[in-house]
Amino acid sequence: MRPFLELQPTANQTYRLIGNSARGNLNARLEQSYKAEQSGDYQSACQLRYEAFEDILATLPDDEDGAVPLDRTHPNTLAAMEITLASAVDNYLAGEGEIAAAQLELLLDCDDEDPLEATPILALCYAMIGEWECLEDIEQDLGDKTALTPLLRALKQFVTTGKIESVTAVQLSRYKEFTAELKRADHPTDEAYAREINSDRPSRAALARELYLRAEIALNIYPQFLSALVAQLK
């Protein structure tokens, strides 16, 4: 009897996750989790994604066998990658930074080009669990076009030295919409925000709020950081 999910090599030295039954149809399982989330049952959505991730993990070889490059052009394999990312985000939002980081590291091992943009979430996970050397290792991959880079640099400086370097605060202040979001007393996720962030071309202000809301989970681990940062921003 064939397994419900199996790893199949391709001619391009990558691998595909082939589904041989309903349980192996990762696209359908991902869609089922989205439907649960849209209906308001977020707990079930997270559980569905994590169970699917466990099946994916069981299909991949052990770590000592080396990374398995996945073929993201194959729909079921791409769904496996999307499930891994979504489950990692679930765990990050739940405060399970170590689990989320392990999931994201696995995802990047399977495709180091990072087509799903897992690196920013991984950076936040490293910040959450205080893995500053790991964060430094991937800082270059974040690039210099996101406020997340100077934000996490400031956090590392604050936690490890007790102060934020003025040059870092200046770098962050260049992201005016994000700086404004940091200074706000509240960060509403009302219908107006939902419409804006889900539009084809969300505003910079909406994107800044989205980044803040995502980063807030990690930043709240260090309760004195935000007030110290805002005090230095111009």
Show where each model-derived region lies.
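Residue-level signature for tetratricopeptide repeat
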Residues: K35, D90, A123-C125, R153-T160
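Structural motif corresponding to the intra-repeat A-B loop/turn of tetratricopeptide repeats
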Residues: S39, A94, I129, T160-T161
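Alpha-helical repeat scaffolds
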Residues: Q13-I18, A45-A52, G97-E105, E131-D144, ...
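Flexible helix-coil transition and linker loops at the boundaries of alpha-helical arrays
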Residues: L17-S21, F53-T77, D109-D111
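Long, ordered, amphipathic alpha-helical scaffolds
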Residues: L152-K234
